C-alpha cells in the first residue's frame, strides 16, 4: 500500500506521497511516483492502491478533466459514476486524491466523492498516521502546507511498514 496526504493552507495546496510499492509483504520498488500533475499542471492527483489500477484511473480522470475544461468537481463526479457502474472499472482497487486551487477531493470506487474537513486528506495504509500528524501540525504550528505534508509523511513512514521515506511532493499556489 502507500500513504498519500493532501494539505491546504495559506493559498497553497499540496499532495504528497511516499514511493513504496509492495507485493504482499515484499517491497518491489521504493521510488515510485504516486503523485502527478494533470490538466496543464492545474490539478494535482495522488493514488493509493494497485499501481496499474491507479494509472487506469489517472487516464480516465484526465480525460474527464479535458472533457469538462478542468472543472474538478464535475470531473470527479463523472469518474466516480463510471467507476461505480462500469463492470471493468468496478474491479479496480485504488483511491484517488485530487486537488486544484478551489477544492480537494477523495474519489473512491464505491462512487464516493468526498471533500474533507480541515482541508486535510490522508489515504492508504499510513493514512491515519499521516492525518493525525498533519492535523496536529495544522492546529498547533504555522508551518506551510508543504512542510506539514512532508512531516506527516515522515511520521507515517516511521510507523507504517508499507510506507517509506521516498517522497514526491507537488504544490499549487493560488
Swiss-Prot record:
Localization per Swiss-Prot or TrEMBL: Cytoplasm
Top-level taxon of the source organism: Bacteria
Residues noted as binding Na(+) in the record, renumbered to the chain: 157, 160, 163
Active-site residue list: 2
EC number: 3.4.25.2
Disulfide cysteine pairs (residue numbers): none
Catalytic reactions of this protein: ATP-dependent cleavage of peptide bonds with broad specificity
Keyword DNA damage set for record: no
Enzyme class name: hydrolase
Keywords: Allosteric enzyme, Cytoplasm, Hydrolase, Metal-binding, Protease, Sodium, Threonine protease
Coiled-coil residue spans: none
CDD domains given in the database record: protease_HslV (cd01913)
InterPro entries assigned to the protein according to its UniProt record, in alphabetical order: ATP-dep_Prtase_HsIV_su, Ntn_hydrolases_N, Proteasome_sua/b, Proteasome_suB-type
PANTHER family: ATP-DEPENDENT PROTEASE SUBUNIT HSLV, METALLOPROTEASE TLDD
Function: Protease subunit of a proteasome-like degradation complex believed to be a general protein degrading machinery.
Family: Belongs to the peptidase T1B family. HslV subfamily.
Protein name listed in UniProt: ATP-dependent protease subunit HslV
Organism: Shewanella denitrificans (strain OS217 / ATCC BAA-1090 / DSM 15013)
Lineage per the UniProt record: Bacteria, Pseudomonadati, Pseudomonadota, Gammaproteobacteria, Alteromonadales
Amino acid at each position: 500500500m502507500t500513504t498519500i496526504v493532501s494539505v491546504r493552507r495559506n493559498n497553497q495546496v499540496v499532495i504528497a506521497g511516499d514511493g513504496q510499492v509492495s507485493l504482499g509483504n515484499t517491497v518491489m520498488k521504493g521510488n515510485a511516483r504516486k503523485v502527478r500533475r494533470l490538466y496543464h499542471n492545474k490539478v494535482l492527483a495522488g493514488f493509493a492502491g494497485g499501481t496499474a489500477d491507479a494509472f487506469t484511473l489517472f487516464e480516465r480522470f484526465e480525460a474527464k478533466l479535458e472533457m469538462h475544461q478542468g472543472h474538478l468537481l464535475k470531473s470527479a463526479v463523472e469518474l466516480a459514476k463510471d467507476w461505480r457502474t462500469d463492470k471493468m472499472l468496478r474491479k479496480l482497487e485504488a483511491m484517488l486524491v485530487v486537488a486544484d486551487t478551489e477544492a480537494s477531493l477523495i474519489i473512491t470506487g464505491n462512487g464516493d466523492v468526498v471533500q474533507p474537513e480541515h482541508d486535510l486528506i490522508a489515504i492508504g495504509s499510513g493514512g491515519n498516521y499521516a492525518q493525525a500528524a498533519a492535523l496536529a501540525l495544522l492546529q498547533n504550528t504555522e508551518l506551510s502546507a508543504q512542510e506539514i505534508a512532508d512531516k506527516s509523511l515522515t511520521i507515517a513512514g516511521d510507523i507504517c511498514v508499507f510506507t517509506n521515506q521516498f517522497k514526491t511532493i507537488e504544490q499549487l499556489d493560488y
